[in-house]
From Swiss-Prot:
Chain's role: Catalyzes the transfer of the diacylglyceryl group from phosphatidylglycerol to the sulfhydryl group of the N-terminal cysteine of a prolipoprotein, the first step in the formation of mature lipoproteins.
One Pfam family from the record: LGT
Keyword field: Cell inner membrane, Cell membrane, Membrane, Transferase, Transmembrane, Transmembrane helix
Coiled coil: none
Gene from which this protein is expressed: lgt
EC number: 2.5.1.145
Lineage, opening ranks: Bacteria, Pseudomonadati, Pseudomonadota, Gammaproteobacteria, Pseudomonadales
Stated name of the protein: Phosphatidylglycerol--prolipoprotein diacylglyceryl transferase
Length: 269
């Protein structure tokens, strides 16, 4: 069994002002995505300035934050937030939904593309390889918060999370680290290498949806479902897995469509 590192969720405290690691992880993810996007900017569109790229990253970040929070409210704990709506704004306590953030990003990309003469999939193909940076950082934030841990296990790398998080004090799968490794590191490597060469429009987006859906679906088998939901079907299906099914199907369809429709200009990201 591995010891859980006791990390204060508050990174910096200046009097009443507290800066949480969870929030810093979002900033790291956004900053890292911007830096890598700037490296590929000329390949995407030589006419784009760094200012326009910054605008894109800003609006996509808003889509992540707003969509992620509203997605959690709608998909995972609607009853609690209807009873106490002010809790919606307490983002630093956790409670973000990737699938909600994904919808938020798509809406932001659709809006930004129309304003800047870019198609939806041009932007999504450009952005997709950058997303795992934020996903990986977010999972580290979950780990520091000692939330979203896995099922009890006797594997050598199991961890006992703090009593405030897990009163049962059982050795558990550090599922946040599994997701960091798969959704952050592995997905980044797959998409970054795949997108180094010109690909048909929609192909990179399809690869993202497919592999994220697969990785998340797998990890959900060892992750404890949200207490307020539990398993929603068959005694094993979680909300996260259910939401991944359309991503996997949609990803396969986009890849098939990208390579089987009439030839068009290649998406260079």
């Amino acid at each position: 069994m591995l010891p859980y590192p006791q990390i204060d969720p508050v990174a910096v405290a200046l009097g009443p002002l507290k800066i949480h690691w969870y929030g810093l992880m979002y900033l790291i993810g956004i900053g890292g995505a911007w830096l890598l996007a700037s490296r590929r900017l000329n390949r995407f569109d030589p006419t784009w300035s760094r200012e326009k790229l910054s605008d894109l990253v800003f609006w996509l970040s808003m889509g992540v934050i707003v969509g992620g929070r509203l997605g959690y409210v709608l998909f995972y704990d609607l009853h609690q937030y209807l009873a106490n709506p002010t809790l919606i704004f307490e983002v630093w306590k956790g409670g973000m939904s990737f699938h909600g953030g994904f919808i938020g990003v798509m809406l932001a990309a659709l809006w930004f593309g129309k304003r800047n003469n870019k198609s939806f999939f041009e932007l999504m193909d450009f952005v997709a390889p950058l997303v795992p940076i934020g996903l990986g950082a977010g999972r580290i934030g979950n780990f520091i918060n000692a939330e979203l841990w896995g099922k009890a296990t006797d594997v050598p790398w199991a961890m006992v999370f703090p009593p405030f998080s897990d009163p049962a004090q059982l050795p558990r799968h550090p599922s946040q680290l599994y997701q960091f490794a798969l959704e952050g590191v592995a997905l980044f490597v797959i998409l970054w290498l795949y997108s180094r060469k010109p690909r048909p429009t929609m192909a990179v987006s399809g690869m993202f949806a497919l592999f994220y859906g697969i990785f998340r679906f797998i990890v959900e088998f060892v992750r404890v479902p949200d207490a307020q939901l539990g398993y929603i079907a068959f005694g094993w299906l979680t909300m996260g897995q259910l939401l991944c099914v359309p991503m996997i199907v949609g990803g396969i369809f986009l890849i098939w469509l990208a390579y089987n429709r009439k030839p068009t200009a290649k998406a260079t990201v």
